[in-house]
Each structure stands twice: as C-alpha cells, then as structure tokens.
Amino acid sequence: MIISNEIKSLLNSHTIGHLATTSNQNIPRVIPICFIELDSHIYSILDKKPKSIPVNLLTRVKNIESNPSVSFIIDYYDDDWKSLWYIQVNGTAQLLYKPISQVVNKLIHKYPNYENMDIENQPIIKISPTSINKWGERFT
C-alpha cells in the first residue's frame, strides 16, 4: 500500500507514535515509539534505552512474533476540537535483524539522541500498511 504525500508529511513531522500489538492470547498492548516513514513503511528500532529485560523478551517483540497484525497511530490534540485529528496505520509487522542504513540514518536525523547510541545492529520493526484510517476536519 502506498502512503499519500499528505500522510507522509504528517508522519515525518511527528516525533511520537503509539504501536498496538496483541499477544497470542488476545491481550492488547500499546506503547509509545520513535519511528520513521520510509518508502510507505513505518520503521521503529529496538534501541538501547534502558530496558528491564533483554530486547528479545520485550512484550512487543513476542507479540509480533506470535501475531504480526499491528496498529500504529499518531494524533494531534488541541483545545479547539475542530483541529483534532489522527492517522491510524493498520498493517503487518516483522522484525528485521540486519541493519538497513537508510532506516538507521533517517532515525538518527529525526532523533539526534540516537547519534550517541549504537543502534546500527539493533533489531528493527517494519510495518507494512494494509489500511490507513484518518479522521479530522483537516482531511475533509
């Protein structure tokens, strides 16, 4: 699925998104993530920020391995409710264990703190969109 330029622009201007995964026992999990859009896919790296367990045991990793259907959302809130909007990307996630320099470089450009982290060899979540829902007056 091709992501429109309008949606790409909004994705590229947002620094936080939320990823929803579901376990094989249908237990949902939503977490905030750093992300980029590249070639109509969403990417997030399993970086080296402090974690209480090894990366391969993270709930999102286990959920993706057992159920690759995910949902990803960015949104905008304002006290003027006519300005509210969201973009929800539903898709299939996969874990990539080989570095993709274009993804790593774009993540470092978007999130300068990654310059001080060794992220080149970290696993990457790749979301391939199957549908996109958007809501808000800006889209009408």
Outline where the language-model segments fall.
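Charged, gly/pro-rich active-site loop segments
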Residues: 2, 77-140
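A short, Trp-centered hydrophobic/proline-enriched beta-strand micro-motif
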Residues: 11-23, 69-74
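A short mixed-secondary-structure module that forms the rim of ligand-binding clefts
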Residues: 38-77
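Amphipathic alpha-helical interface surfaces
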Residues: 7, 56-63, 100-103, 107
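Active-site and channel-lining beta-strand-loop segments
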Residues: 16-36
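Hydrophobic/aromatic beta-strand elements that line small-molecule binding cavities or substrate pockets
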Residues: 32-35, 61-62, 91
